[in-house]
A protein has these predicted regions:
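Short cysteine clusters
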Residues: 211
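A conserved hydrophobic position in a structured secondary element of the catalytic/binding core
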Residues: 214
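Positively charged n-region of N-terminal signal peptides that target proteins for export
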Residues: 1-4
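Hydrophobic helical h-region of N-terminal Sec-dependent signal peptides
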Residues: 9-15
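Cell wall/extracellular polymer interaction/catalysis modules
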Residues: 26-208, 218-255
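Signal peptide processing junction and immediate N-terminal pro/mature segment
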Residues: 22-24
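C-terminal motif of bacterial Sec signal peptides marking the signal peptidase cleavage site
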Residues: 17-20
């Protein structure tokens, strides 16, 4: 079953990488989600005890760049249901982020603390910032320059733009239509790493610089569903599931 899952994911990812598949040219179709019982291991995760909602990023191995991303919600009876599932990408060098520029996705339990994007607010529970020409994500390690935060150049006119460490959000029209910041290095320790987002899939690259990417229609759905209390759980599929297979009953079924 795991081999079958990997083959299907690889095929879906190849399709999504085709020009025009990551972002639609016309009006974006609404992804309506799914509603199926989550695999048993989801409810056994450490984050499941306190969380009412979990976004799970399950990489196929520690050095893989592809992953299966799913959103789960706790029901009134304590059971978990999966409401979104999608193939996606993680860092070019897999999992295990420890420093700026290592092109790895962090492992652990996080939350979303910022919502922003080039597009209009899709209806976020987290306060949303529509970016403009002056919006950057700061990678400037100097004191007072708000490393690992969304900033406006009008407020920080001295931000270092020459090094390329700070991301100019509108320069990434595919990736950053919609973005949620994952709370890695929330304290903003310079050099530990910055700009770890859940964002839209872009064509051509089967990896990210450390972020997590999913198709734009799925991303918009996620932004409409999650809030600041949503647990973001990232690890290998084997570590998360204990090596169990992903049941056939949880394959995507459109509502």
């Amino acid at each position: 079953m795991r081999k079958k899952l990997l083959v299907v994911v690889c095929l879906l990812i190849l399709i999504l990488m085709l020009p025009g598949c990551g972002k639609t040219a016309g009006p974006l179709d609404d992804y309506q989600g799914i509603d199926v019982v989550s695999p048993d291991w989801v409810g056994k995760l450490d984050a499941a005890g306190d969380a009412k909602q979990m976004l799970i990023v399950a990489a196929f191995s520690a050095d893989a760049t592809d992953a299966w991303i799913s959103l789960h919600e706790k029901q009134s009876d304590g059971s978990w249901h999966m409401v979104m599932t999608s193939p996606g990408f993680i860092g070019k060098n897999g999992l295990g982020k420890t420093r700026e520029g290592d092109a790895k996705t962090p492992v652990g339990i996080f939350h979303f603390n910022r919502a922003f994007g080039i597009a209009d607010d899709p209806g976020c529970a987290i306060p949303y910032v529509k970016v403009d020409q002056d919006t950057y994500w700061s990678g400037d390690p100097r004191d007072g320059y708000r490393y690992n935060e969304l900033v406006n150049l009008k407020d920080l006119p001295g931000l270092d733009l020459e090094s390329g460490d700070s991301e100019h959000i509108i320069d990434y029209p595919y990736h950053y239509q919609y973005c949620l910041n994952i709370s890695y290095n929330e304290e903003g320790t310079p050099g530990l790493g910055s700009a770890i987002f859940l964002h839209c899939l872009a064509p051509a690259k089967p990896f990210t610089g450390g972020c997590v990417s999913i198709p734009e229609d799925h991303m918009r759905f996620v932004m409409q569903k999650v809030d600041g209390s949503t647990a973001v759980v990232i690890d290998t599929y084997e570590a998360l599931s204990g090596g169990t297979d992903w049941p056939d009953s949880t394959w995507p079924q459109e509502r």
